[in-house]
Amino acid sequence: MDDENLWKVVKKDSIFETTHFSSKPVFTRSFSTKTSSSSSKPVFTRSFSTKPTSYSSSEPIFRRSFSAKPTSSKSPFLSRSGSTKCPVDTSSTSKCSISRSLSQKGASVTRKCRNMAKEHKSRFYIMKRCVLMLVCWHKHACDS
């Protein structure tokens, strides 16, 4: 393979479809905007999947999807989910599956962040008062 052909293959190599000298894409990403039937506002969806060329299965190992759907309020609700499937043995059909929904954990994460911010603010206030007290005490000790 000469340099010109190699450059053409590398030039085709992009973040959205990576060939790596293979006819099947290893990494694909797609975007689409849809208008929901209930409202005229567009819904943004994004999906991402990887397919290793060494496995014979046509099912992707890792899938991630995002969608933003407008609710009855003015702010859009962002829903994010992820799932991972990993083959235990390439010859068998048994696979381990891990899935989670981040929108369910959003409330607990927000609560934890809010509590940490309050705690940080109270610690800063206590330290500020202690430093102020020491400065005033030192000032009165020097004046006497």
UniProtKB/Swiss-Prot annotation:
Its main location: membrane. The keyword Plastid does not apply. It is a single-pass membrane protein. PANTHER family: DVL13, SMALL POLYPEPTIDE DEVIL 15-RELATED. Residues 68-84 have a biased composition (Polar residues). Small polypeptide acting as a regulatory molecule which coordinates cellular responses required for differentiation, growth and development, probably by restricting polar cell proliferation in lateral organs and coordinating socket cell recruitment and differentiation at trichome sites. Residues 30-58 have a biased composition (Low complexity). It is found in: Cell membrane. Residues 108-139 are annotated as: Required for DVL/RTFL small polypeptide activity. Keywords: Cell membrane, Developmental protein, Membrane, Transmembrane, Transmembrane helix. GO terms for cellular component: plasma membrane. Belongs to the DVL/RTFL small polypeptides family. The chain crosses the membrane at residues 42-58. InterPro entries: DVL, DVL_RTFL_polypeptides. Residues 30-89 are annotated as: Disordered. This is Small polypeptide DEVIL 18. One of its GO terms (biological process) is negative regulation of cell population proliferation.
